[in-house]
């Protein structure tokens, strides 16, 4: 019985890889030294008829089981032999078909959760998807020409990437605030035009406006706000926080009382000498 199983396993070809229904399996290895293969499960991205999708149909490859060490650059290099690529994006979970695609900020975005991810690979031509589905492996993620950083080298690189460029950060913040101010101005102008105008049913929309105007986003106004906050923090600072500070403050207070007492005694002696002492 055991001999039959061994013969059957020997006759089975290596390319027969179990995969989920509708997916093709692509074996990959981290490097040449690794013996075991990891499998990417791919299929052509498709949605139901009449449903909008942020990814182009017939040119998008959906990838499952992407390991943490496989970056967008690595996945792009692995699939570059299938045809010219337009974009590669890795995500924590698949996109909803009807969810709007938001622009990704370079600095303000949630930290990705470490673990396996899904990928969307967009080719310039539909033939790239067909070539990727027929791709044979194993493919190497880390090579001598394109090494993948691991260990302390990866930690150093991640730390360096976590420090933003001040000028690029300022440009992105200014761009966002300009777009936000423009949006608010358009909404206020539209509300002002519709003020007092009845709708189809004869109702008049009443909007509340604050008495205090919005502070302008100028450098002088920002400096005034910062100075006001600094003075407020100074007033709220803890006094006599430590025990030795409390003892010193009590000693200084007693010294001031003694000094005032001596000054009062001298003044009383002086008034007695001048015979103008009036205790009541």
From Swiss-Prot:
GO molecular function: RNA binding
A cellular component annotation (GO) from this entry: cytoplasm
TM stretches of this protein: none
Quaternary state and interactors: Part of the small subunit (SSU) processome, composed of more than 70 proteins and the RNA chaperone small nucleolar RNA (snoRNA) U3. Interacts with NOL6; required for NOL6 localization to nucleolus.
Entry's localization field: Nucleus, Nucleolus; Cell projection, Cilium; Cytoplasm, Cytoskeleton, Microtubule organizing center, Centrosome
Record function comment: Nucleolar protein that is involved in ribosomal RNA (rRNA) processing. Also plays a role in primary cilia resorption, and cell cycle progression in neurogenesis and neocortex development. Part of the small subunit (SSU) processome, first precursor of the small eukaryotic ribosomal subunit.
Keyword flag Manganese: no
Segments forming domain RRM: 59-159
Name of the molecule in the record: Ribosomal RNA-processing protein 7 homolog A
Keyword vocabulary terms for this entry: Cell projection, Cytoplasm, Cytoskeleton, Nucleus, Phosphoprotein, RNA-binding
Species of the source: Pongo abelii (Sumatran orangutan)
InterPro entries according to UniProt: Nucleotide-bd_a/b_plait_sf (IPR012677), RBD_domain_sf (IPR035979), RRM_Rrp7 (IPR040447), RRP7 (IPR040446), RRP7_C (IPR024326), Rrp7A_RRM (IPR034890)
């Amino acid at each position: 019985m055991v001999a039959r199983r061994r013969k059957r396993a020997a006759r089975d070809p290596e390319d027969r890889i179990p995969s989920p229904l509708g997916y093709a399996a692509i074996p990959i290895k981290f490097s040449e030294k690794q013996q075991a293969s990891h499998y990417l499960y791919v299929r052509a991205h498709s949605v139901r008829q009449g449903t909008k999708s942020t990814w182009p149909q017939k040119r998008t490859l959906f990838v499952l089981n992407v390991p943490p060490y496989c970056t967008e650059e690595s996945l792009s290099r692995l699939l570059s032999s299938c045809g010219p690529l337009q974009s590669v994006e890795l995500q924590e979970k698949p996109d909803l078909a009807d969810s709007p695609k938001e622009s990704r900020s370079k600095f303000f975005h949630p930290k990705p959760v470490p673990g396996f991810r899904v990928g969307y690979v967009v080719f310039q031509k539909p033939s790239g998807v067909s070539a990727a589905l027929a791709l044979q492996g194993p493919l190497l993620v880390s090579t001598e020409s394109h090494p993948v950083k691991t260990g302390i080298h990866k930690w150093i690189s991640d730390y360096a990437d976590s420090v933003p460029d001040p000028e690029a950060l300022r440009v992105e913040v200014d761009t966002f605030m300009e777009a936000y101010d423009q949006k608010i101005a358009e909404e206020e102008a539209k509300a002002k035009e519709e003020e007092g105008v009845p709708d189809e049913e004869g109702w008049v929309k009443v909007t509340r406006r604050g008495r205090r105007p919005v502070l302008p986003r100028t450098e002088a106004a920002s400096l005034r706000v910062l100075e006001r906050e600094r003075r407020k923090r100074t007033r709220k600072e803890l006094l006599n926080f430590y025990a030795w500070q409390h003892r010193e403050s009590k000693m200084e207070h007693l010294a001031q009382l003694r000094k005032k007492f001596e000054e009062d005694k001298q003044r009383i002696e002086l008034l007695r000498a001048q015979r103008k002492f009036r205790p009541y």
